[in-house]
Amino acid sequence: MSVLVSVISHRPFKKVKVQFDYLKILADEFGIDVQFQYQSKEYYDQVPKEYFESMSILLDESATCAGDNLYNSSKTFHKYDYILNMDDDLSRFSDVVLKEGKLGHTVNSSTGRDYYDVNLESADVLNRFIKDGIEKINSGNFAYVTMQGRLFCEYRDYVWKDTKSTSSTQFALWRSGLFKEAIDYFRQFEFPRVHGYDQFYRAYAMDKGYTYSCNIRMALYTKNQGVNDSVIRPDGTFADLSVLDTIFVKELYPGMFKYRKMRTGFVKLEPGHDDGIDGYLKDREINTLNNHNLDKFNDPYIKDISKIRSGEYVK
């Protein structure tokens, strides 16, 4: 079985060093091919020599999204049985350190919160999650695994045709038979671009049991601290969802989730806004919690709307 882990980044090396360390483990200890693509020559030149010895590090200033180098090269794409596209968004996790092959104990400089030792070798953790994800795909389900960022497994016969309107999540749901069902379900909410909201599809599929989702850090920490923009199910299991996902899932499944304190608040959905996911994420500092109408949610976990609006954690 041949596997390629592909990453694209627009962040300086120091911001993604932790991820580079994980990728080096995958390459050195598991023999997995790793391809890291930089969009900036300045950042590309910052990468220490030892990482080039373990993985393929490319420079493509014209690339616009993760996987451009793969989807534009059918020879590379069809060479592997599985391609794992990993997001490089590690900026808020940069204080998590890797010590002697283990996730160590540190204090987040921005929040002052402790992170706790997990006492599990990182390499073993990565191997287990990747193997489990591939098994999920082989069983006909779509695997969505988070590892200090987002790592998702794609079917090898998927052809990326339009990065603005097609997502691997949607494609996988189509393959699993949930895509049409999800679209029909979401249309009742009158969203301007149903096809652009793969966060909806992911949450919907997860609730149906089709998506495997787990943040390694959240799943293994002995205490539920340090991850501000996430939600937790009433039964205590974690759902790795972004701030944007939280609003979607909250609206779709009242009572299924309870809020944790949000780092940047909530995103307001405005009719006619046609920038899709990226546009909403760019606006999330403006469209914060106070702008979103939470009163319509009938959620037993919300005891006081004003506390939610002020950013307090409501148990």
Q: In which residue ranges do the predicted regions lie?
A:
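Hydrophobic targeting segments
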Residues: 2-7, 23, 33-36
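C-terminal catalytic/acceptor-binding lobe
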Residues: 15, 19, 193-315
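Short aromatic/hydrophobic "clamp" motif used to bind/position activated sugar donors
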Residues: 83
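Conserved catalytic core of nucleotide-sugar-dependent glycosyltransferases
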Residues: 93-194
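Active-site-proximal specificity loops/subdomain of glycosyltransferases
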Residues: 38-80, 93-102
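Short, high-confidence coil segments that cap the C-terminus of an alpha-helix
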Residues: 80, 139-143, 210
